Amino acid sequence: MNSESIAVIIPCYNEALTIGKVIDDFHRELPQATVYVYDNNSSDDTSRIATEHGATVRFEPRQGKGNVCRQMFRDIDADCYLMVDGDDTYPAEAAKALCEPILNGTADMTVGDRLSNGTYAEENKRAFHGFGNNLVRAMIKWIYGYSFDDVMTGYRAMSRPFVKTFPVLSEGFQIETELSIHAVDHRWRIKDVPIEYRDRPEGSESKLNTVSDGIKVVAMIGTLFKDYRPLKFFTLVALLFAIVGLALGIPIIVEYFQTGLVPRFPTALLAASFMFLCGLSLATGFILDSVAKVEKKQWEVNVYSKYTFGDYRNDNTNAR
């Protein structure tokens, strides 16, 4: 490890049972790092225990992990941001392996992969979490062409340029998915780091609701699909309209050639409407695709200018 600054950032909600051990473990593994705990309206002694164990404690009143991460990214300045949950499910022993590629300039985001070595399948006791992770991985691979080993992990390290140019849109547990999609779409360098996983200790409860938060994650993927890949998104929408329009219209066309009449005029009008919506969706996709490309070019120029002249200039860090 070099002398560059590391911030261990821990979003917390009612983690009094485990937060003390988590802080101690990261102080042991990364003695040069500053540990930040952001208390998100905890009703237990999370903030008091975190303070007693030497963490810098701050408070975020807007409920939700995404809201906490947004504020952490705005508040904290560091060369490497190591984000971890406060539930003691992620090993501090992997911290150096996650931070090293960030600090030596070979990655912009490292991802703590719980799945490759099988420990998540062995330790996780919550139904459908593994299925949900695989579903999200498959969706991201289909849309963006990148295969994450573990897309939902809460243990990852990020560079300063990545953090300071990442627009947090989500409010809750969609943040991990949003981080992953942003990294892929903006071509940041990503490195998977296999880690051991352990389930929450007895008495510690997960804040993640499998069904409602799962729906929010899928909705976030759809929203970012529309924003980042508008041509592909609206082409699929146009295809759906075309299928319905043709299913309604072909029998009417056949009947017209046979009889010279259009007896089901309302159905014909509906079929024509669906075909019009098909064309409109395609046009929308082409227009928004042009807008998205211009925005992406501008984003790249802004990041490049900051690397060259601004906050990210660092002789020890390679440009993207």
Please name every model-derived segment:
Residues 1-2, 170-320:
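Hydrophobic helical membrane-anchoring modules
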Residues 5-7, 34, 178:
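Cell-envelope/extracellular polymer assembly enzymes that use nucleotide-activated donors
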Residues 14-28:
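Short, well-formed alpha-helical segments that are part of the catalytic scaffolds
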Residues 15-18, 42, 65, 91:
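Donor nucleotide-sugar binding loop of glycosyltransferases
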Residues 39-47:
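A conserved acidic beta->alpha catalytic loop
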Residues 61-75, 80, 92-173, 199-215, ...:
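Acceptor/aglycone-binding surface of glycosyltransferases and processive sugar-polymer synthases
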